[in-house]
Amino acid sequence: MEIILAEPRGFCAGVKRAVDILAITLEKYKNERQVYVLHEIVHNKYIVEGFKKQGVVFVSSIEDIKDNRGILIFSAHGVSKSIEDEAKRKGVQVIDATCPLVSKVHKEAKRYEDSGKELILIGHENHPEVKGIIGRVSNPISLVQTMQDVYNLQIKDPDNLSYVTQTTLSIDDTKEIIATLKLRFPSITGPDLKDICYATQNRQNAVKKLAKITDVVLIVGSKNSSNSNRLLDLCISTGKRAYLIDNYKCMNKNWLQGAEKIGITAGASAPDILVDELVNYLKINMNTKVSVMPDGFTENVQFKYTKW
């Protein structure tokens, strides 16, 4: 039995930046000021639980902050303008760990609105990133999740229309939705697939290749991770067996029955340690060898960190 690792996999630059910002803040202010994070810093159970053990308090609203002397960190997914304003009124120090690629979408949405465009957002309802984008503009945004949503759209002025997208969507699904939007509204403007995060695209392209050369694919990532779920969907769409797991403890050996080659990848919010533990578990229990997929590559993207 052989393990084949996808490349690239795991942490993207935006997730690494957010996790590092939280770790540095915690180290700088430990024993002095309480560190809060609005929602999960990234969608990964291992990361969140690790920070909880170090004293970080994760809150679901600004009202949950008990100590106004505390420090509040906005997660990688970004927040609405109203939440920013509420934090200012609360008087807490804010450190923004929003992924720069998400911030780019915020600016695009505002720019379209300022130019008088009616806006469509391609994204998943209730995802924190989507809530943040919607909350960056004053006028209502039409949310599109499926092709059927495109057909159901009620638009005031089809000739004055723009769209933006969530950064962690399926490239293939989004491409179809954009094509349908352009077919129905020929004058619509938008960024094509440029708003889909580079890491999301790279991991989806890699997992497609991985599915072709393996019998079963294991995706390391949390159930609430949008990009991890898209990797799962992609594998299943190819007809391959695929499973999304938080860590090696979630493994079921029956999943691997009849498999000679096991593909392993990880969502953009899953740390390397979880992949390493899974590989070690399989090496010990299944007598496997390990290789990296052909044509893989290492990402070299880095984002500037917030100054504080």
Curated annotation (Swiss-Prot):
Enzyme class: oxidoreductase
Lineage top rank: taxon: Bacteria
Record protein name field: 4-hydroxy-3-methylbut-2-enyl diphosphate reductase
Sites where the protein binds (2E)-4-hydroxy-3-methylbut-2-enyl diphosphate: 43, 77, 127, 167, 225-227, 269
Alphabetized UniProt keyword annotations: 4Fe-4S, Iron, Iron-sulfur, Isoprene biosynthesis, Metal-binding, Oxidoreductase
UniProt family annotation: Belongs to the IspH family.
Active site (record annotation): 129
Residues that hold [4Fe-4S] cluster according to the record: 12, 99, 197
Enzyme Commission no: 1.17.7.4
GO molecular function annotation: 4 iron, 4 sulfur cluster binding; 4-hydroxy-3-methylbut-2-enyl diphosphate reductase activity; metal ion binding
HAMAP family for the chain: IspH (MF_00191)
Binding site for isopentenyl diphosphate: 43, 77, 127, 225-227, 269
Pfam family, one: LYTB
Function field: Catalyzes the conversion of 1-hydroxy-2-methyl-2-(E)-butenyl 4-diphosphate (HMBPP) into a mixture of isopentenyl diphosphate (IPP) and dimethylallyl diphosphate (DMAPP). Acts in the terminal step of the DOXP/MEP pathway for isoprenoid precursor biosynthesis.
